[in-house]
A protein has these predicted regions:
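Hydrophobic packing residues in well-ordered alpha-helices of helical domains and bundles
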Residues: 28, 48-51, 55, 69, ...
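Short, conserved micro-motifs composed of acidic
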Residues: 53, 68-109
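Structural signal for well-ordered, non-membrane alpha-helices
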Residues: 20, 56-63, 136-143, 163, ...
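Short, charged alpha-helical motifs in flexible N/C-terminal segments and linkers
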Residues: 59-78, 171, 180-200
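Short, conserved non-catalytic motifs in the polymerase core
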Residues: 1-11, 38-44, 99-101, 107, ...
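Catalytic palm subdomain of template-directed nucleic-acid polymerases
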Residues: 24, 36-60, 175
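Basic, alpha-helical interaction scaffolds
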Residues: 102-172
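Active-site palm subdomain of RNA-directed nucleic acid polymerases
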Residues: 9-38
Length: 200
């Protein structure tokens, strides 16, 4: 199946649709070729043991279905309250078929999933910083274009370049601390003032 074909993603999803049967402990989230696994346990030692055991089962399922996990793109995050420290870093391992051995996955403070930056404390700081960076660039574009194109096209630019970042995943990050939301509000107001500037 060609990589960029229209049927490719659908057929791949059908092919891996029963991967969840490989483990009773994980919750699987599948989107196109992006798969995320979650597991919850208050005891870090139990978590380490269970996750390693279950990842072994997932690896066996992948091998049986002639699929290879991209170990370089695989990592994990431990979600926890800000005040709770991790007493040790769990060694989460997955089988690497290229090296024919188990390798330790990298623990991250945050991960990007479907365009949303999710950090270990669910503070959404990384995601807000990411959005602010993207919106700042778009505000710069509007600032340059405001003298050359009519207002309705500037509004189109706003809805194409800025609004999607403000709307995407807002159900997840929209309840973040007000100080983070204020950063977005300042940028949004700046963009709208630039659009209004022509007619003020």
């Amino acid at each position: 199946m060609p990589q960029s074909s229209l049927l490719g993603p659908l057929l791949f999803l059908l092919y891996i649709n029963d991967i969840h049967k490989s483990s009773k402990e994980f919750t699987f989230y599948l989107f196109a070729d992006d798969t995320s696994l979650t597991y919850a346990n208050d005891n870090l030692r139990t978590l380490e043991l269970t996750v390693n055991n279950e990842l072994g089962k997932v690896s066996e399922w992948l091998h049986a279905n002639k699929l290879t996990l991209n170990v370089k793109k695989s990592n994990y995050v431990i979600f926890r309250p800000r005040q709770k420290r991790i007493p040790f870093i769990p060694q989460i391992k997955i089988f690497n078929p290229t090296l024919n051995t188990r390798v330790i996955l990298e623990m991250k403070d945050f991960v990007k999933y479907l365009g949303i930056m999710i950090d270990s404390e669910l503070s959404w700081k990384h995601h807000i910083d990411f959005i602010c960076h993207k919106i700042s660039r778009s505000v710069g574009i509007i600032a340059k274009m405001r003298h050359y194109i009519p207002r309705h096209l500037l509004l189109n630019l706003y809805h194409a370049l800025i609004a999607p970042y403000l709307n995407d995943g807002i159900c997840a990050w929209g309840n973040c601390p007000q100080t983070y939301l204020n950063k977005l509000l300042v940028l949004q107001k700046h963009a709208l003032r630039l659009i209004k500037y022509l007619f003020s």
